[in-house]
Amino acid sequence: PDTKIAVASYNFYFASKLNRDVQRILEGPNYKKIFPDTTLSRNNAVTRLGSYLRNGNEFEVVNQIGGLKSVGRGGALTGNKVDVMLMDDLYKDYMEANSPVVRESVWDWYTTVVDSRLHNESQQLIVFTRWHEEDLIGRLEQKGKVKEIHNFDDIYQPLKHDEWIKINFEAIKQSEATELDPRADGEPLWPNRHSKESLLSTMELDVEKFNCL
C-alpha cells in the first residue's frame, strides 16, 4: 500500500481503463479477504485537497502513501516519484511500431520522462508485442542492459538499477523448452483463446507479422 506505481500505455484512454480495472479489483471481496486494511476513498476526489485522490486515472490508498497513476504514452509524470513503472502496449499496432517517428518519440519519452522519475530501488516492467526490432525493448538491448532468462532462479538474481531481464513467450513454441516455458515444440501459448489452427491460419496470411507474435 505504500508503493507508488505508474502505468502507461499507447494512449490515455487505455491506461485509464487499466487504472479502473485495478480499482475494481481492490474493492472486490476476494482482495478484501487478503488485504482488509487496503482501502480507497469512497468518493471520486479530483484533487488532493481535503481527501485522498481518486478518479479515473489516479488513486491514493487511504492512510498510506502509495497509489497508482496512469498516463498515456508521452504523458507527464512530473512531481511523481515512481517505485514501480509498468508499460503495457506502448505501440498501438504494427503501423505505429514501424513508424520511425513514433519509435523515436517513445524513446525520448522514456529517457526524459520515465527515467527521470525512477530511483535506485525502482522496478520496471515492459510488456508488448515485438512489432519492430528497434522498439523500446530493442533499444535497451542495444545498450547491453538486457539479458534473457529461462529459469525461475534467474528471476531473483540481483540486478543493477539499469539492468533488465527478458522473458519471451512465443505464440507457437519453436525454441527449446525451459523451466519458465516448458511447452513442447509446436504448442500454442494460450490454446483456449488462440488455438494452434487459428495461429497457423494467421501465419499463412503474413509470416513476417506472425513472427512478431
Regions found by a protein language model. Give the residues of each.
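An acidic- and aromatic-residue-enriched active-site/binding cleft used to recognize and process polar
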Residues: 10-13, 73, 90, 129-132, ...
